[in-house]
Amino acid sequence: MGARASVLSGKKLDSWEKIRLRPGGNKKYRLKHLVWASRELEKFTLNPGLLETAEGCQQILGQLQPALQTGTEELRSLYNTVAVLYCVHQRIDVKDTKEALNKIEEMQNKNKQRTQQAAANTGSSQNYPIVQNAQGQPVHQALSPRTLNAWVKVVEDKAFSPEVIPMFSALSEGATPQDLNMMLNVVGGHQAAMQMLKDTINEEAAEWDRLHPVHAGPIPPGQMREPRGSDIAGTTSTVQEQIGWMTGNPPIPVGDIYRRWIILGLNKIVRMYSPVSILDIRQGPKEPFRDYVDRFFKTLRAEQATQDVKNWMTETLLVQNANPDCKSILRALGPGATLEEMMTACQGVGGPGHKARVLAEAMSQVQQTSIMMQRGNFRGPRRIKCFNCGKEGHLAKNCRAPRKKGCWKCGKEGHQMKDCTERQANFLRENLAFQQGEAREFSSEQTRANSPTSRNLWDGGKDDLPCETGAERQGTDSFSFPQITLWQRPLVTVKIGGQLIEALLDTGADDTVLEDINLPGKWKPKIIGGIGGFIKVRQYDQILIEICGKKTIGTVLVGPTPVNIIGRNMLTQIGCTLNFPISPIETVPVKLKPEMDGPKVKQWPLTEEKIKALTEICNEMEKEGKISKIGPENPYNTPVFAIKKKDSTKWRKLVDFRELNKRTQDFWEVQLGIPHTAGLKKKKSVTVLDVGDAYFSVPLDESFRKYTAFTIPSINNETPGVRYQYNVLPQGWKGSPSIFQSSMTKILEPFRSQHPDIVIYQYMDDLYVGSDLEIGQHRAKIEELRAHLLSWGFITPDKKHQKEPPFLWMGYELHPDKWTVQPIQLPEKDSWTVNDIQKLVGKLNWASQIYAGIKVKQLCKLLRGAKALTDIVTLTEEAELELAENREILKDPVHGVYYDPSKDLVAEIQKQGQDQWTYQIYQEPFKNLKTGKYARKRSAHTNDVKQLTEVVQKVSTESIVIWGKIPKFRLPIQKETWEAWWMEYWQATWIPEWEFVNTPPLVKLWYQLEKDPIAGAETFYVDGAANRETKLGKAGYVTDRGRQKVVSLTETTNQKTELHAIHLALQDSGSEVNIVTDSQYALGIIQAQPDRSESEIVNQIIEKLIEKEKVYLSWVPAHKGIGGNEQVDKLVSSGIRKVLFLDGIDKAQEDHEKYHCNWRAMASDFNLPPVVAKEIVASCNKCQLKGEAMHGQVDCSPGIWQLDCTHLEGKVILVAVHVASGYIEAEVIPAETGQETAYFILKLAGRWPVKVIHTDNGSNFTSAAVKAVCWWANIQQEFGIPYNPQSQGVVESMNKELKKIIGQVREQAEHLKTAVQMAVFIHNFKRKGGIGGYSAGERIIDIIATDIQTKELQKQISKIQNFRVYYRDSRDPIWKGPAKLLWKGEGAVVIQDNSDIKVVPRRKAKIIRDYGKQMAGDDCMAGRQDED
């Protein structure tokens, strides 16, 4: 029984029972808490005997503490109980659990300091399993078989659930790589998981090698080599080397590094086995908060995140994803609330009852004059203050004062306070000269006059002092603030001690440091940290300094500084603040994907001319502020290269951002497509603008810039490469388009709202501006727009400013009253590559939007299959003909017109053949707005009507996108054909208004199916069957006139055989035929009336259908005893299907009438499909009244039973439930006495292995008779587990289930005791479900058998220690040994030879029994074996 009541005795027990569970609570610790703690320790494979001593308790606390952050409430309760018990053992006086935890924390902090001090003094490692021998040398002590067994058990039990990771962490603490490999080998049977783990370890090892290159030259004597990735993984290093690294000076913790790699891999495995994200865990409307917390923490343990991130998730997501009722309570508790407080506050929340209580509480507070807070009711009424005017007593939304512009928090315009990201706009804000909102008096024009990314230093003096860079303001309340731009270094002329010098205003420097200046007075020496190291300076106090007319006195340092610096000690005294005014373009915050780091791709070699070109380009970009030089502290890199521009000698810099793109967060494409010219309205005046260096005008998020680092190498590695990072959006980075489009839209918004009569089409850096103004006025507005863009840093170059038609825009050519695509030249080639054909198809597709009749189907066929871009393609005759037709179409230029909103749209569609269609959209005949083509084939079996609907839907979608409305359609199909198709077609689709146009070729239906059976025609029942393994099948039919036929098929499937059967029926029937099938697949194909198909058999069926005068096709469900269908099914199933017919329906119904078993049991016992079994249950008048009880499985040990008494018909029924399986033993007892209960328990113990019984506190269960039986049968009795929500839940649930079954069979029995036993039989053997789909009877047997096998396995593990192994090393042919056998697997054994643990293949090991002690060395081994 382990540590139970023997843990405490005498005075210690008295002290234990005086300690309260909670501060100020009534409940105190009792003996049952010790019993519960010892049971819980057994679950965690910890020895309950440790509870008997203070040292044991300390060991338990050390094991449990690492798992507290991610553990359940039960784990925390166990930790608290053991902490209190430790205090009792140590005779530390504590009053409650909280006080005990504080004492433990103090003790742990002291121990930690002591350990750190000792380690610092001695330099020795305290890590297990590295221990010191008698000579003080570190030696390796292998992991014990007990530890390995615990690890195997946790993997087998938990199956890579989140609990595996903390368990691995705890078991592998301080282990060497060799120990860790041993742990992985013993669970090597999980091949998929181990492969994932291996891949992760290989990746991390490769990354280690990359970051830690091998130093050139020989290793100095006495110095160890540096470990490689494979050494850390233990594959190319010995235990002695690993110990050397771990205990060296400085140490290299190879064990911890390898552990970290394994935990990374385990996280991936856990993620695969537990795919639910923490973001998906949300509390249901009526879900108890405790259940939600359990689900939340279970998922949290599977998340691949650091502990800090997990803590953040707990603090924010737990509250954020709670339901509204709980969320309001949790927010009222405040951010510092503990989980225990949350769970207490949210008890009973949810459902109508809670709503009623909240409503009643709200109604009761209507009469009260003061508002009371949920916490701190005696703090008085809450004082509210207006953000707008600053007065108390009202909120900003009710303020009558004029609303102040900009944000109420930071004073900036462009956003509201709720969107404000400013935390502290100014450093040292207490020294700000202006109060409240006075800083907002600056006009936006003045702030924007600077460069796009400017930051400014403002002097907040109260006096109107003149300064060159200042901005003067008139008015009584205004101040003059000198302004220094930070676009360049803020160098100003200052007067110090009467001398004028130029100095840098540096808000990042603490002190004012000057060079080459003679100051009066005494000085004292001082050393300060400067750029590049420490510098010696002279310190002068009380020196007068004047900056921009502002005077102050302070300390000045004089010494060899690279530049004169005015530091914060002076700047703060004159009221100088660092301001970040609204950046003309706000940076969009960007992050990497979770758990990813920036790119670390090496720069590849470049030619001399490319290096020179890149150096020149980068120098220019650096001057413009687009990139900045960086130092070696940035570990990231992306390759850069250069190409020559088209038709030019100039070079173009390209950066290969593929790796960064993979790692960058995803963006939403702001613009979903490109604007089309057909949607443009005709305008009197038009201008096309292009934004120069578009991306380079938008700043990149400062925190993200480091990831864009790149290196310009030198020739022959003459010097280290020059490193840069981007300050603006880079070309080729995935985020640039979205961020640019978003920024551009915000910038154009004010101009659009001021000029609603001007149309601006924006796509990336191309702008189309149209208006109905006269040309002079229009051009004035254009200049206004250009100035507006320039104020935000966007330049519109003159060379790309198109004032006169034709305008080239987005690949189109725009004229005042018409448009076309820019001229297209199709190349003439003798040989075509795959790349050439791809470009050709792209050009033709682009031309097809205005040139009607373009086809590309035959050209696209040439590209089928996986081909390289440079492969030569031979044009087929069809492709050459198609290309020649396209050339003819493109010879004559075609123009489209502009859209007139006052006229209707019309769309006309023509069939071109070979599944190709063309269409034109116009408002006036022969003046097309747009044309297009359609050649997509959506399904294998189709007809022209179906394809026509697909074209109509494509044109409708296109029209909605371009014009916002749907055109009227003119289609080449007659109304009768259309209606015949759509009346019967099962997959109805919406079609807009249309009219018939007689444009050959017309669309028609080639055959039609009848709606009703054909009188007098022969009826064919068809069916097919195929065997999945052999691919053999049969198809056949049976007719109502006695005819039948079966044909054998090879390499077929069930679906093909069904179609073959229909073909047989059509082949052997007359001109009129009725066909009945049980295949929904075949029915769906034929009812759609296809006229062509990719399937040969479907094409043959179509040919036969066209030949027939009338065909009726019908469907019946299979296996329902329908005459002809059943006959043909038996005919084709012979020798093909394994299970033929449901002969068991009658037997199942008869069985259900007797036992009322559930559908799972019938499906299993009588081989019925679930739908049939459920139908039997649904048709039973006794089973359909209530829903079937749901059974879960509680994770408990095999020997635990719950007992309870229930009452029915005035009699007592004693019920015992095996918790793990749900198996029931029940009996009607004469009276609810201890004697009867004891007799029942004795009978139960005689039938099943009973270790623990869990009962309530009824007098019969607490009687002396029951205690005596439990003592005799060695049964432990429990009356309740602290903090366990299960309590008596299992047996209470079974009581209800048992009564329900008794109600169903009560009529069949005369006496209640008979009905009870019948109900027990039904529950145990006639109801299936839960894990494995077992009945309760099958499950209990399975659980007990598994338990016996597990114990036997453990015995075998202990037995193998009695064997010794002689083995041969791969490099040495001499046999070694004897070694101790630790583990025997299928292909290898784990052995211990002296202090080394090795894995040896079975073929190189000889295992023999140890028949006696050896003469030397075995005493040590035996001692260690006993310890294990």
From Swiss-Prot:
Region (Dimerization/Multimerization of capsid protein p24): 273-359
ZnF bounds (CCHC-type): 384-401, 405-422
Positions of the UniProt region annotated as Interaction with membrane phosphatidylinositol 4,5-bisphosphate and RNA: 14-33
Positions annotated to bind Mg(2+) 3: 1204, 1256, 1292
Extent of motif Tryptophan repeat motif: 978-994
Region Interaction with host CALM1, annotated ranges: 8-43
Binding annotation for Mg(2+) 2: 1023, 1058, 1078, 1129
UniProt remark on cofactor binding: Binds 2 magnesium ions for reverse transcriptase polymerase activity.
Region annotation (Disordered) ranges: 108-130, 438-475
RT 'primer grip': annotated span: 807-815
Domain (Peptidase A2) ranges: 501-570
Residues covalently joined to lipid (N-myristoyl glycine): 2
Keyword Secreted: no
Region (Interaction with host AP3D1): 12-19
GO MF annotation, one: DNA binding
Region described as Interaction with human PPIA/CYPA and NUP153: spans on this chain: 185-223
Motif position, Nuclear localization signal: 26-32
Keyword Magnesium: yes
Residues under site feature: Cleavage: 128-129, 359-360, 371-372, 426-427, 434-435, 481-482, 580-581, 1020-1021, 1140-1141
Cofactor section: Mg(2+)
Motif (Nuclear export signal): 16-22
Protein name: Gag-Pol polyprotein
Source species: Human immunodeficiency virus type 1 group M subtype A (isolate U455) (HIV-1)
